[in-house]
Amino acid sequence: MVLNYIFVAFFMIAFAIGLFRLVVMGDVEVFPAMMNSTFESSKTAFEISLGLTGVLSLWLGIMKIGEKGGVVNVLARILSPVFAKLFPDIPKGHPVTGSIFMNIAANMLGLDNAATPLGLKAMEQLQELNPKKDTASNPMIMFLVLNTSGLTLIPVSIMVYRAQMGAAQPTDIFIPILLATFFSTLAGIVITCLFQKTNLFNRTLLLTLGGMCVVVAAIIWGFGQLDKDQMNVVSTSVANILLMVIIVGFILAGMRKKVNVYDAFIEGAKDGFTTAVRIIPYLVAILVGIGVFRASGAMDMLVDGVKWLVEACGGNTDFVGALPTALMKPLSGSGARGMMVDAMTTYGADSFVGRLSCIFQGSTDTTFYILAVYFGSVGIRYTRHAVACGLLADLAGVLAAIAISYMFFG
């Protein structure tokens, strides 16, 4: 529903501004430019989708090997001590615990197709424990925030888009996304714990979150000792080594479980081809809408307005061109993806704006969509502090993404 409103708004606002420019300013080129943008954008959307097929098939094939090799189960076991403290209202040994672990682990690995059904199952089980069936319980809200904060270990789709858009090193945003998504998730956990009066000084929570903060601080400090060129080389090298380790690790996990690794890869790769074809109409719709919006001058007005405000406050405005992606992300994943592609098309995949838009895309998730799907599936009407916690986590992710982008690419 939100995406419907956004799609309609792109055209209505573009038409109104185009009419104003024609009638008041005498700009006879605005409507031809808007119509040309529809043809160019639809062509671009198809070409991007076509180019995605190979790389998407590769990574979904690798992910299928990991899934069949039990990597999700391993992550679930690692997370279990911490999650027991984050969900104190869930009885020990309840089946919902397994569903929550599996959902979060699948999200961390970027297995969206597996994560959503597991998430809906977990929400149904949480509803069974909920004394007020129309009101979100504390475990429901914590579970939702962990989903909306978008903790991701392998941002496959973003790297795939960067490769297709001609980035020299599609993986150079890997480390920045890991750092930004860590901050959004940490903020979401802390804020939700404060709302729910959960003891953050519990030994397990304190050691885990504190230890992660120390590791992230050490990474940031280490990169801070390097100049920009060294930072880019080290970041890209580490990212590629980590990704190769993940690929080999998934294959070894599959072999250990006696999985037919080749067949598992082919099964996942087929899903990649299907996914690439399935996204064509969605990408056409959103890129055409954005193209018309930009051709009318509306996007420039939005960006220039924010830029003026930032300049008035004495701030650097390099990040402003990527803000449409950040603003769209809580509302629509497809819309944000379109904004990211538009930013890379307009400014370049290796520009500061192009990279930052990718980090925005990877640092958080679609808060309102997840809230509507998960809570709607069990008939929740009163969301309590879920929206506030989710949006504050998004804000933390956006601010972290900006700071980290200036550090790595500024």
Regions found by a protein language model. Give the residues of each.
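Hydrophobic alpha-helical segments, principally membrane-spanning helices and signal/leader peptides
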Residues: N36-F39, F46, P95-T97, K132-M140, ...
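Membrane-embedded alpha-helical segments and adjacent helix-loop junctions characteristic
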Residues: E29-E128, K257-T346
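C-terminal transmembrane helix pair
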Residues: A115, A122-R162, A167-K197, L323-G410
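Signature of multi-pass transmembrane helix bundles
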Residues: M1-G54, V160-F293, E311-C313, H385-G410
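Sparse, context-dependent recognition of short Cys/His-centered cofactor- or disulfide-binding micro-motifs
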Residues: L60, H94-V96, A136-P139, N240, ...
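Generic hydrophobic alpha-helical membrane-segment signal
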Residues: V2, I6, P91, G98-I100, ...
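Generic signal for short, ordered secondary-structure residues
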Residues: F101, A105, M140, M231-V234, ...
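Aromatic-residue detector
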Residues: F7-F11, A16, D27, E40, ...
